[in-house]
A protein has these predicted regions:
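Core catalytic alpha/beta fold that binds nucleotide/phospho-ligands
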Residues: 1-144
Length: 144
């Protein structure tokens, strides 16, 4: 069946345990598509439906488990994390996934915090002004 081709045993078991299985199947399918778009592949490059699996942690939060070719592609791209957000109504399902790579994490860590940079520049400017003002104060000092 379509469900067996597309969804893992765990995904099917979860969806079938809900009051509206169709909505949960649709949401998981949207999640698979979102993950593959985040990887830049879609269902191509040898990636099968079962290569992307949506599971839930102990608190019910969805997370992605990659298998087969999808895992290989993610590893090739240096994907470190794939956060996933799912939402649905009675008639619509939406999923958003983001592929966070080692490179993007490194770039974020190297990025300068604008507030820290401004504070640093202010201190440097203050120090320069104090140095410029020091000779003037020395000449005005009656002890000199």
């Amino acid at each position: 069946s379509f469900r067996e081709k597309v969804f893992s045993e765990e995904e099917r078991s979860y969806c079938e345990s809900t009051a509206n299985p169709e909505v949960h199947y649709a949401t998981r399918f949207a999640a698979k598509e979102a993950v593959l778009k985040a990887l830049g592949t879609g269902f191509s490059r040898g990636i099968a439906n079962h290569d992307v699996e949506v599971r839930r942690n102990a608190k019910g939060r969805p997370f992605v488990v990659l298998h087969g070719r999808a895992k290989e592609v993610a590893d090739e791209q240096g994907v470190r994390e794939l956060p996933l957000s799912l939402s649905y109504t009675h008639t619509d399902a939406v999923a958003c996934a983001l592929a966070i790579t080692e490179e993007s994490v490194r770039a974020q860590e190297e990025r300068v915090n604008p507030m820290e940079e401004l504070a640093k520049q202010f201190k440097e400017a203050r120090s320069l002004l104090d140095e410029m003002d020091a000779p003037k104060k020395a000449s005005e000092d009656p002890a000199n």
